Amino acid sequence: MIRLGINGFGRIGRQVLKAVLARYPRSLQVVAVNDLFDVGTNAHLFKYDTNYGRFSGDVRIKKDAFLINGQAIKSLAFRDPASIPWEEEGVDIVIESTGLFVTGPQASAHLEGGARKVIITAPAKEEDITLVMGVNHKAYHPKKHHIVSNASCTTNCLAPPVLVIHQAFGIEKGMMTTVHSYTNDQRILDLPHKDLRRARAAFQNIIPTTTGAAKALSLVIPDLAGRFDGYSLRVPTPTVSIVDFVAELKTKTTTEDLRQVLRNGARKMLKGIMACEEGRLVSMDFKGDAHSSIVDIEFTQVLRDNMVKVVAWYDNEWGYSCRVADLAHYMAQKGL
């Protein structure tokens, strides 16, 4: 049993714990959570979730721990990652989900505390490697890669269909837009923020802002370095987002051939990572979907032989958290 610690018990940290419990109950175990809020608050927010409803299992508090279905998870509250006693808790892999410690040097503090590996749940800088499950996860090498970024939820949505299309037809260049649900890095009401657009009320505006998802493609699909760019539109929905990208192909194709290539990729190479949806659905229909990317077939088409538009849905909280759990499991299998 590989032992996990979670640093930062916010939206992603809590969903990662649920994903581990649901997907890997016999191979992964979360044994400690480090968060500055008290154990009672964290247990309450874990059990009662506005987006996903009440947790079906048993959640109780016991001194400095909370018990989930009888399993004790130590509650820690250290502000400095270097002070967290991961070694005392026997933690093998730390899930760094605060959104604060997103560089290699910052995340390496967890290694100093006794952990063997760190997975950053965000785009990172100076990390050992960025991995997207289904795309480049096989590049992981246990002796070389200790600080691993799971990229962003948007990169995890964008990369699978891009990989399938690039392998089939070759991509010359592309532009993407993610229509993204609001997150905690926005303001509920107008309030100062270093990004003046994110300073505006999240529930009342469509907010254009940056995304590193397109540029991060080059980290997981090196062939596309410098060939993709894009931006984000934050919208007043609580979860589930959608990527819309246009790309110029190197070879000609048809709408039906493009759709079939994506269907085949979802059934074979990217099974469980990418799916194709034939129905006429809307965002809330994908809430709780564990796929990284769900291609909307009706809105995926070709213009004049070599310009393609692809639309793909993703639950930016749950789908991404499932990939974090998958990555931890994969790393454990390949060696720490």
Q: What would you call each of these model-derived segments?
A:
Residues A77-D80, L224, A290-I297:
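A general structural signal for short secondary-structure boundary/capping elements
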